[in-house]
Design a protein with these regions (language model features):
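ATP-binding Walker
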Residues: 17
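Hydrophobic anchor at the beta1->P-loop junction of P-loop NTPases
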Residues: 11
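Phosphate-binding P-loop
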Residues: 1-6
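Walker A/P-loop
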Residues: 20
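Conserved substrate/cofactor phosphate-moiety recognition/catalytic segment
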Residues: 23-64
Length: 132
């Protein structure tokens, strides 16, 4: 778990669910890590199970390096990699993403702080910001 005086916020869901839009609104003045940007920075485009696990660990490590609040935005298909985040926002706005392999491996969360089912989510962003 992150330091008690900082929140690590995970925005996760299928491709096309609105993760990046939500995360950018939330992270206006916060450190923000987008999956595609991080993959580009590390030149790591491995989407196998092992590649996705490596990316999940990398995203959490980057968020923790800030020693402050941070927002992380990525698919995070495996439930086990979501537990370390303080706030978990599931973008459950679509039933299927663009990629069949991702749809098949994506595990519904055992727990999330917020479940976003439509694009009227400004109240959720405000609620999270109040905690910071």
């Amino acid at each position: 778990m992150a330091q008690s005086n900082s929140y690590k916020i995970l925005v996760f869901g299928l491709p096309g669910s609105g993760k990046t839009t939500f995360a950018k609104k939330l992270a206006k003045d916060l450190p923000y890590f987008n999956n595609d940007d991080v993959r580009r920075m590390f030149n790591d485009w491995d989407f196998s199970m092992h590649g996705r696990i490596r990316q999940a660990e990398r995203m959490y490590c980057l968020a923790n390096m800030t020693h402050d609040h941070a927002v992380v935005d990525f698919i995070c298909p495996y439930d086990q990699h979501r537990h370390d985040y303080d706030v978990k926002v599931w973008m459950n706005t679509i039933k299927e993403g663009r990629y069949n392999d991702t749809n098949q491996m994506f595990e519904k969360p055992s727990h999330c702080t917020f479940e976003v089912k439509d694009y009227k989510y400004d109240h959720i962003i405000e609620e999270i910001k109040k905690k910071l």
